[in-house]
């Protein structure tokens, strides 16, 4: 069982790699806890896959409650915690079985490492380690050095990026050329009740998604091409602010109808807020959004 809202490459892995190998995936709306519980009872899955903060609409499933249901069904819960990072949420402490992070993103944080991390308990460690040895999941020594260098400053960077994202999201809410803003700290967020419970430190991540008012793809491209400091890039979690167009990047493998069903519209962009002065990020967004 997997959440309907996932990173596009994760969706592709489940449907284009696992499915031909005989692993069926049932996609469920993880914003509906009863639907998740019913799906687990009906299908008795071998695993459950979800994200702490869903990409790109930043919905926040009730991880702790889903973990309890998974444990009751003796089903491993796999959580991608890349957006939230261990600074905000530690899924293993909430009952998850396996946690994955893109090392490329916040943990290394400088856009110069390609790698990932799997964190688990002793029960799953041995088979995962054997799989790693067989398939060659070994990071090179220099990449490992760069990653460890990045981890040393990770808390400082993350706190700054979270604070910046709060300011940017708040500013975007009142911009005349923005239709809707998606950010976990929004008091009107549909998952606000359990966001407070899951994010006790008051840090809500550095990702902000928003819809450009009345924009088609050409208008979105004009906005992104008008950015002077923020980099149009297919990544996130760097010290530099970056903007991505989900319809043409992270979720490009989905059909337009599939994206529409998920709520990923053609005027949606995803902003990874960096460590720059928040005023500079806001100024760049403002001039780009006002560009004809």
PLM region spans:
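Conserved small-domain helix->loop->beta segment predominantly found in fold-type I
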Residues: 166-240, 254-260
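Structural beta-strand/beta-sheet cores of well-ordered domains, especially the beta-sheet scaffolds
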Residues: 75, 114-115, 156, 179, ...
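Short, well-ordered beta-strand elements within core beta-sheets of diverse protein domains
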Residues: 147-156, 205-214, 270-274
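Conserved PLP-enzyme active-site core in the AAT-like
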Residues: 1-177, 182
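PLP-dependent enzyme catalytic core of the Aspartate aminotransferase-like
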Residues: 15, 214-215, 241-292
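Short, flexible turn/loop "capping" segments at secondary-structure junctions
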Residues: 109, 141-143, 199-203, 261-266
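Hydrophobic side chains in well-ordered alpha-helices
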Residues: 128, 219-223, 281-285
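Short, solvent-exposed amphipathic alpha-helical segments in soluble enzyme
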Residues: 16-19, 134, 225-229, 286-290
């Amino acid at each position: 069982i997997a959440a309907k809202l996932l990173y596009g490459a994760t969706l592709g892995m489940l449907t284009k790699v696992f499915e031909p190998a005989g692993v069926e995936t049932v996609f469920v709306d993880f914003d509906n806890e009863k639907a998740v519980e019913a799906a687990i009872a009906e299908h008795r899955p071998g695993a459950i896959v979800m994200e702490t903060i869903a990409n790109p609409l930043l919905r926040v499933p009730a991880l702790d409650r889903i973990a309890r249901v998974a444990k009751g069904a003796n089903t491993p819960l796999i959580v991608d915690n890349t957006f939230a990072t261990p600074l905000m949420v530690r899924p293993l402490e909430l009952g998850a079985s396996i946690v994955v992070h893109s090392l490329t993103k916040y943990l290394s944080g400088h856009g110069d490492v390609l790698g990932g991390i799997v964190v688990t308990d002793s029960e799953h460690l041995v088979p995962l380690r054997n799989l790693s040895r067989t398939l060659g999941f070994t990071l090179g020594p220099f990449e490992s050095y760069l990653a460890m260098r990045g981890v040393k400053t990770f808390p400082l960077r993350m706190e700054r990026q979270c604070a910046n994202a709060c300011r940017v999201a708040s500013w975007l809410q009142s911009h005349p050329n923005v239709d809707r803003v998606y950010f976990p700290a929004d008091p009107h967020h549909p998952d606000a009740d359990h966001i407070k419970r899951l994010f006790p430190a008051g840090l809500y991540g550095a990702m902000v998604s928003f819809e450009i008012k009345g924009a088609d793809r050409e208008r979105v491209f004009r906005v992104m091409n008008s950015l002077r400091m923020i980099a149009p890039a297919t990544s996130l979690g760097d010290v530099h602010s970056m903007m991505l167009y989900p319809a043409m990047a992270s979720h490009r493998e989905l059909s337009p109808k599939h994206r529409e069903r998920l709520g990923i519209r053609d005027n949606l962009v995803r902003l990874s807020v960096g460590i720059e002065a928040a005023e500079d990020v806001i100024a760049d967004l403002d001039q780009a959004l006002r560009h004809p």
